[in-house]
Regions:
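Transmembrane beta-barrel wall of Gram-negative outer-membrane proteins
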Residues: 95-233, 237, 250-253, 261-279
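Outer-membrane beta-barrel translocator domains and adjoining extracellular loop/strand segments
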Residues: 94-97, 125-134, 178-195, 231-247, ...
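Extracellular loop and loop/strand-boundary signature of outer-membrane beta-barrel proteins
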Residues: 142-147, 188-197, 244, 249-257, ...
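Residues that define the transmembrane beta-barrel architecture of outer-membrane proteins
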Residues: 64, 94-100, 151-157, 199-205, ...
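N-terminal, post-signal peptide beta-strand-biased segments of exported outer-membrane/organellar beta-barrel
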Residues: 25-128, 149, 415, 440-443
Length: 497
């Protein structure tokens, strides 16, 4: 049987990826250890290549690239205003989101820049039901659903500014902030909770450099620092027995949990011609992650679980652009090493008789993640219309080695899964406007849960609790109820001439 603490540790590492916006993932690497269906909450910037599998290494995305590496704004050929309403839903009423991003891109003779704002609604389809055993027919625990716990509003803002230093070199800097009242799926992380009030923020700063090395060879470099901070006020309804009145009572208990993660990263890309109208080159990314505080979710019986991670991203891209035809392929390998640990809150005696003091490590976890990503896309755009097709495939493998200091036990666990993301799009072009639709569907993820036959009766209502971005996994073998994620984005672009 899989150990409860082992699965809890796997989930803790999976939870760290929540702070990474998908649209900024070029320089920040998400850590994922379980195949949870994730919505596109952080898709808050327009993208020309979204329907082409989001290929990016050797095929430019002039709308998204400047927000990833601000110096790439030097490649803008004209100023434009863009509106990109985005909608996503997770199959099985597991959540949905609606976002309205507005962006402006400016290109001058020497200076260039851009700004983007977005307003978002996160919809909790299921709510957060309370699961409490009723001791008798006289106790009715049915509670009205809190409307303020169902939906939440988030706001985002980002911008960049750059300068063409010469005909070959450009420099840029950018920043992004977000005010969050919900991270999709967190409501289901706390088993048995009646309501969850979330409040937090994200801030991100980055700088970039782009250089033409001659003969159409290009070097791109970017550095980024990203911080995520959330507070969770979680309310529980608990049944207690009053010996004086000889009756049961329901009381409300509120817990405050903190979620903190910071990431510092370096991103490099080199591309060069490899034939007529073809480009290719390697990419390399390194992230140093610090996890000073991860929330104590309802299943987590070992609180105060800090950690550190080193994540790498290395790959190669191939791109082709000839007339109306565009084609791109990305192949990326991601190795990640992560260490987390639990610290004793009080004095603890090990099974061997050693006395651990407060602050000493009680559990040590060593993770190795091995991920492989393949993205390809093709599109054809004429002066009036166009289409795009894409496919993304990802292989995820996780190895965990856990040392329980208190019980002197060592455990190992391996997890693996595949994800598939087909995408498609259409383009209509007018003399003074462009309308672009992109849709994609992610399969291979869903709602992980524990096999009922192996569920422990001592667990507190933690069976099959899954969310859009996270998972609480109780003790026992895991099974997967697949839930597709479907995303639609409609972009309207108006050139500013």
């Amino acid at each position: 049987m899989v150990d409860r603490r082992t699965l809890a540790s796997l989930f803790r590492l999976a939870a760290l990826s929540a702070a990474i916006p998908a649209s900024l993932a070029g320089q920040t690497i998400a850590l994922r250890t379980v195949p949870v269906a994730t919505g596109d909450q952080f898709l808050v910037h327009p993208s020309r290549n979204l329907a082409m599998g989001s290929v990016s290494i050797a095929l430019d995305d002039p709308w998204l690239d400047p927000f990833l590496n601000p110096a790439l704004g030097s490649l803008l050929d004209e100023s434009a205003f863009l509106a990109s309403p985005t909608f996503y839903g997770i199959e099985g009423d597991n959540g949905a989101g609606r976002t309205v991003p507005l962006s402006g891109l400016f290109s001058g003779r020497r200076w260039f820049g851009g700004v983007a704002v977005a307003l978002q609604q996160i919809v909790d389809e299921n709510g957060s039901p309370a699961w409490i055993v009723r001791p008798g027919p006289w106790l009715d625990l049915r509670q009205p659903r809190r409307l303020d716990a169902a939906d939440a509003t988030n706001s985002y803002a980002s911008g960049f500014l750059g300068l063409r230093l010469s005909a070959r070199w450009s420099l840029g800097a950018g920043a992004a902030v977000a005010k969050l009242n919900a991270v999709d799926g967190v409501d289901l992380l706390y088993a048995g909770s009646q309501f969850i009030d979330q409040d937090g923020k994200i801030w991100d700063v980055r700088a970039g450099l782009v250089g033409d090395l001659g003969e159409e060879r290009r070097l791109e470099a970017a550095v980024v620092h990203h911080r995520f901070s959330m507070n969770h006020d979680v309310g529980y309804l608990e049944w207690v027995w009053d010996p004086e009145t000889m009756q049961g009572q329901v009381i409300e208990r509120i817990e405050e949990n903190l979620d903190r993660t910071s990431t510092t990263g370096l991103h490099l890309v080199f591309t060069a011609p490899v034939g007529e109208r073809w480009r290719a080159g390697p990419t390399f990314t390194v992230n140093r992650k610090s996890h000073p505080k991860i929330p104590n979710y309802d299943l987590m019986n070992v609180p105060r679980d800090p950690g550190n991670s080193w994540a790498f991203n290395m790959g190669v891209g191939l791109g082709h652009q000839r007339g109306p035809l565009r084609f791109g392929v990305d192949v990326i390998y991601e190795p990640v090493w992560s260490e987390t640990w639990a610290e004793a809150a009080d004095t603890v005696r090990t099974t061997g008789g050693t006395l651990l003091q407060p602050g000493d490590r009680t559990v040590e976890n060593d993770f190795f993640l091995s991920n492989l990503h393949l993205r390809l896309g093709i599109g054809r755009e004429t002066e009036r219309w166009g289409f795009q097709l894409g496919l993304g495939a990802s292989s995820h493998e996780t190895q965990l080695e856990q040392w329980n200091v208190v019980e002197a036990e060592r455990r190992e666990q391996d997890e693996s899964w595949m994800e598939w993301t087909p995408s498609f799009g259409a383009v209509l072009k007018f003399p003074d406007a462009e309308v672009r639709y992109a849709g994609r569907m992610t399969t291979g993820t869903g709602r992980p849960s524990v096999d009922f036959a192996f569920r422990e009766g001592t667990d507190r209502a933690n069976d099959a609790l899954a969310a859009a971005d996270f998972l609480i996994a109780p003790s026992g073998p895991l099974i997967l109820q697949e839930a597709r994620v479907i995303t639609h984005q409609l972009t309207v672009r108006l050139p500013l001439r």
